[in-house]
A protein has these predicted regions:
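Helix-helix packing/entry segments at the starts of transmembrane helices
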Residues: 48-49, 90, 104-111, 175-198, ...
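Specific transmembrane alpha-helical segments of multi-pass solute transporters/efflux pumps
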Residues: 25-26, 30-31, 59-109, 145, ...
């Protein structure tokens, strides 16, 4: 019986890491796609429009599967998720990308695991072992060191916006993961999108440009990606992974996101991928493995 119980726990944890990894891969395209989109869309309109599109599909999913409304005590946590990942993070990153390059902004995402783990402790009641924090801090330092090695930003406003984006996103991730244990992974992001509808839908209409005739196909495709994949599909996998494998543990997979994102930026925006990126990626993978081992 004990052996079966251990196997089920291990299997659930492994599934959590797989789901979390899929979510990270999807999220990795968010900043390069946003960078392409803000070249032609106003950043505030882009944020509201991506949430509006995603919320329509979210409402459709909830209706098709006849999901029950959340309990009264779940609406406030859903509001926190909505403010963090539906509005806060997309808006702050879109504004930041007016000041800094896609590659520069991506490396700040390396701080997300630490932010998620901190809020996982504060909001989710998790208690990782001390060695976990060592690997988490080391991974974050490696990513930030890589960012600094590329040169300090000439636009501190962009850096500040990215740091704020990381904080609100970490809070939204941790709150959503905690809520997904009782509400369900995809249900959390869907209801969070629905909560945001009274704000994002009217603003999308109000802030819409007078004409869309000058918008290129890459900009439209980027809007579609951040609306459907970054805002909805990615979270289905991500929240399920966090709930299965633990917020602090699976959250360490975010350390890989900057490097996936840089690879996409190189392909989409023709930015150079250096040997240093490859070396730091290997080191960060080691930190992720160490964090996973000592997370519980």
């Amino acid at each position: 019986m004990d052996r079966t119980s251990r196997f089920n726990t291990l299997d659930n944890s492994t599934q959590g890491w797989i789901n979390g990894f899929i979510g990270v891969v999807i999220f990795s395209g968010s900043l390069p796609a946003t960078r392409l989109a803000v070249m032609e869309f106003d950043p505030v309109f882009l944020t509201m429009m991506r949430a509006t599109i995603a919320s329509v599909f979210a409402l459709l999913l909830l209706w098709l599967f006849k999901e029950k409304r959340p309990a009264r005590n779940q609406w406030v946590p859903l509001g926190i998720v909505s403010l963090g990942v539906v509005i806060g993070f997309p808006l702050l990153t879109a504004l930041a990308l007016q000041y800094v390059t896609s590659a520069h902004s991506i490396v700040f995402i390396g701080l997300l695991p630490l932010a998620t783990a901190l809020f996982g402790v504060l909001r989710g009641g998790e208690r990782p072992r001390p060695v976990f924090w060592l690997f988490s801090m080391l991974g974050s330092v490696l990513v930030m060191g890589y960012a600094l090695a590329q040169g300090l930003s000439a636009a501190p406003a962009g850096d500040l916006l990215m740091l704020l984006a990381v904080l609100v996103c970490g809070l939204g991730y941790a709150e959503g993961a905690k809520l997904s244990r009782s509400l369900g992974g995809w249900q959390v992001i869907c209801w969070a999108l629905v909560v945001a509808m009274p704000v994002v839908v009217p603003l999308s209409v109000t802030l819409a440009p007078a004409s869309f005739s000058g918008i290129s196909l890459p900009a439209w495709l980027s809007l579609g990606y951040v609306a459907l994949f970054s805002m909805l599909i990615g979270f289905v996998f991500w929240y399920r992974g966090l709930a299965q494998g633990g917020i602090a543990a699976v959250g360490q997979l975010q350390l890989l996101q900057p490097f996936f994102g840089l690879a996409l930026a190189a392909g989409l925006l023709h930015e150079q991928v250096s040997l240093g990126m490859v070396l730091v990626t290997v080191a960060v993978i080691g930190c992720v493995a160490g964090a996973k081992k000592f997370a519980r």
